[in-house]
A protein has these predicted regions:
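Short N-terminal helix/helix-N-cap motif within the alpha/beta-hydrolase-1
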Residues: 20-28, 46-49, 85-86, 112, ...
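Conserved hydrolase catalytic core segment
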Residues: 72-112
Length: 252
């Protein structure tokens, strides 16, 4: 999706087992005033791919190539969940084209030894990806809704061949690369956070003034933190007005 005119350009990247349609409220608003871009990553939505291509490194390279091909300048990269890693990786590859980054309800799936982080993530899947995906996504919502059910069902339907490879590779990237990626960001960073995730994958809602290890890490790299309370993991869908307000204020 590539619509709208106006600077600065905004590029939106979805999360694990998700699609660009998760940005529907943001795309509808910002295409009126900005050039907006949203893509389906390999193996997601309408974009084909092979399991060996599913990694944060591949996705970041794809987004960086898209930025170059569209000749975006002073762009703001906006990622949700896994998309936070992707925009950080893309910004590392094309730093001169990126003015800032917005990270929406990001987290860290692995730390310490990358091999151990990847192995632990594979063990968590346990050979039953649909059950893993349902457990993972059910915990992202605190209130029942038709939209929540649809997002969980989409994740369960997603390719086990992709998901069972991508999740461990994401944990490995978190352990190996997140600090260096944050250190190379030249532009500003805004974190819009609504939940904290534990090692058991369980999420808890955040209140204003609360923090988490992930947010403390971001603060150490100069990020601005904004808490959106009483909201699940899909902050941009559950609290679109607040998210859009924060994006509009930051991306100037």
């Amino acid at each position: 999706m590539h619509e709208g005119r106006g600077a600065p350009p905004l590029l939106f990247v979805h999360g694990f087992a998700c699609a660009h349609t998760d940005w529907k409220f943001q795309l509808e608003q910002f295409k009126k005033t900005h050039e907006v871009v949203a893509c389906d990553l390999r193996g997601h939505g309408a974009t084909p791919g092979q399991p060996h291509e599913c990694s944060i490194e591949h996705y970041g390279g794809d987004v960086a190539a898209l930025i170059n091909n569209l000749e975006l300048r002073n762009a703001f990269l906006i990622g949700h969940s896994m998309g936070c890693r992707v925009v950080l990786e893309a910004a590392r590859l094309v730093p001169k084209r990126v003015a800032g980054i917005v990270l929406i309800d990001g987290s860290r799936a692995g730390s310490g030894d990358p091999d151990a982080a990847e192995s632990a993530a594979r063990a968590a899947i346990g050979g039953n990806y649909p059950a893993f995906a349902e457990n993972l996504f059910r915990r992202m919502f605190f209130k029942p809704s038709v939209e929540a059910d649809a997002i969980v069902a989409r994740a369960v339907r997603s390719s086990a061949a992709f998901g069972a490879e991508l999740w461990p590779r994401m944990a490995r990237w978190d352990a190996a690369m997140v600090e260096s990626a944050l250190a190379t960001v030249r532009g500003r960073i805004l974190a819009i956070q609504s939940t904290a995730r534990g090692a058991d994958l369980k999420r808890s809602p955040l209140k204003p003034g609360e923090t988490s290890p992930w947010l403390e890490l971001l603060k150490s790299y100069g990020a601005r933190i904004e808490i959106v309370p009483d909201t699940g993991h899909f902050t941009q869908l559950e609290a679109p007005q607040r998210v859009n307000q924060l994006i509009a204020e930051f991306c100037r």
